[in-house]
Design a protein with these regions (language model features):
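Acceptor/aglycone-binding surface of glycosyltransferases and processive sugar-polymer synthases
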Residues: 65-81, 86, 99-183, 209-218
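Conserved donor nucleotide-binding strand/loop of the catalytic core
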Residues: 33-36, 47-81
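Short beta-strand-to-loop acidic/aromatic patch adjacent to the donor-nucleotide binding site
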Residues: 85-93
Length: 238
């Protein structure tokens, strides 16, 4: 089995090399894997950092957008270049630990499972600084609400619909037309996978939450409203 690890990047000059290094350190696994980096029109030195990493990881696939198009578009571009049996998304910051990827793959062995999500929301987030508490609690509660809406609308219980760590079969996208350009990619692909009959299995993962001072780009209120509308829209339409 081969897994395509897609890494969308937008202005992550401080972390992208570390993330790619951690992915490389996955080493030999029970599955083969490829790493596909999609630079989404970064305006900082992310491209230079990616080039440095490619010197250390010759098989690294790099695709670039001339202009910023959004995370959803970056992931869709990565999927077009993927050759694996399964696809998993890895954010370019240090919030998600690549060491959890083998655990996601292992979970495919559970009977009837074809899609695996890594859930952060079976517990309160790991908060490091007092001033972050209101922000992360808002984000946590917003995600729980959206996950509850997903569960009600699509008939399968999920605790973390918005998680970055989504492992799904590439062939499952053959009959799915993805349209999202931004962060609404998360609810769109979840909605469409569930409507096609996929069973999503969740496993707990550890994360290191970051704030806007660390480069976080998600707007909890704006993107939360868009996610809610996306879930409702695809419940009604294909």
């Amino acid at each position: 089995m081969k897994v395509s690890i897609i890494v969308p990047v937008y202005n992550e000059e401080k972390t992208i090399c570390k993330v790619l290094s951690r992915l490389q350190k996955l080493g030999k696994q029970d599955f083969s894997y490829e790493i596909i980096v999609v630079d989404d029109g970064s305006t900082d030195t992310s491209v230079l950092e990616i080039k440095k990493s490619k010197l250390q990881i010759p098989k690294l696939k790099v695709v670039s957008h001339r202009k910023n198009k959004g995370k959803g578009m970056a992931v869709r571009t990565g999927i077009k270049h993927a050759t694996g049996d399964y696809v998993v998304i890895q954010d370019a910051d240090l919030e998600y630990d690549p060491q959890d990827i083998p655990r996601l793959v292992k979970a495919l062995g559970v009977a009837g499972v074809d899609v695996v999500y890594g859930t952060r929301l079976d517990r309160l987030p790991n908060l490091h600084r007092d001033e972050r508490v209101p922000l992360f609690l808002l984000h946590f509660l917003g995600n729980r609400f959206l996950s509850l809406v997903t569960s009600i609308l699509y008939g399968q219980w999920l605790t973390d619909m918005e998680t970055c760590y989504k492992l799904f079969p590439r062939k499952a996208l053959t009959n799915i037309r993805l349209e999202a350009k931004g962060f609404e990619f998360e609810p769109e692909i979840t909605a469409k996978l569930l409507k096609k009959g996929s069973h999503i299995y969740e496993i707990p993962i550890k994360t290191n939450p970051r704030g806007y001072d660390d480069g976080k780009k998600l707007d909890t209120t704006r993107d939360g409203v868009r996610a809610l509308w996306t879930l409702i829209k695809y419940r009604i339409y294909d």
